[in-house]
């Protein structure tokens, strides 16, 4: 059954193109210092070129990173790539307050992507053996979450209009030979800006939120000196 969260405001923040590490630290700080009344948030960001290793990551799946940095992350899953033209959406949801479980959230995120792609006439599906969203046998969206004190952070990475070559330098999500695809390969001309409003609308619909309210984002708001730092992002 779909959760109904009409009474729970959700805030949307547009971050633009950002390096991974400071945004990850900001997300950790937000989660660490949020309270029972803090509204849930969605962050939309494109990251500068980076490989991130999830908690289950193994070094043998990083084949030839070359000039792209590899950063350890505390999200679920294994290694993936982020770069310009890929829409990352971080979802900071108080699961306790929403009375939903992790599996429900994962399903909602996967359905968000499936419905977003359907809007652009792309058929896709989730797989029970490998989190994410796929078009036939090719992966188009990766997913990795972390739960702390009953609240989610991290989220999804949807390939839209990017250079897919760096995925050849890794075994994406720990699968040797995993083929990647993107929205623009299936529907030429579609951009990140085209996808963003559909993605946000579908996520709020999946969880029954009211319309997300766009508010400004400043990194300095999240990296205050009183906030603790973390070496694992």
Curated annotation (Swiss-Prot):
Pfam families associated with the record: LplA-B_cat (PF21948)
GO CC annotation: cytoplasm
Reaction(s) catalysed (UniProt annotation): octanoyl-[ACP] + L-lysyl-[protein] = N(6)-octanoyl-L-lysyl-[protein] + holo-[ACP] + H(+)
Enzyme Commission number(s) from the entry: 2.3.1.181
List of catalytic residues: 173 (acyl-thioester intermediate)
UniProt-recorded Gene Ontology molecular function terms: lipoyl(octanoyl) transferase activity
Disulfide bond positions: none
Domain BPL/LPL catalytic: 36-211
Subcellular location: Cytoplasm
HAMAP family with a match to the protein in the record: LipB
Functional note: Catalyzes the transfer of endogenously produced octanoic acid from octanoyl-acyl-carrier-protein onto the lipoyl domains of lipoate-dependent enzymes. Lipoyl-ACP can also act as a substrate although octanoyl-ACP is likely to be the physiological substrate.
Protein name as catalogued: Octanoyltransferase
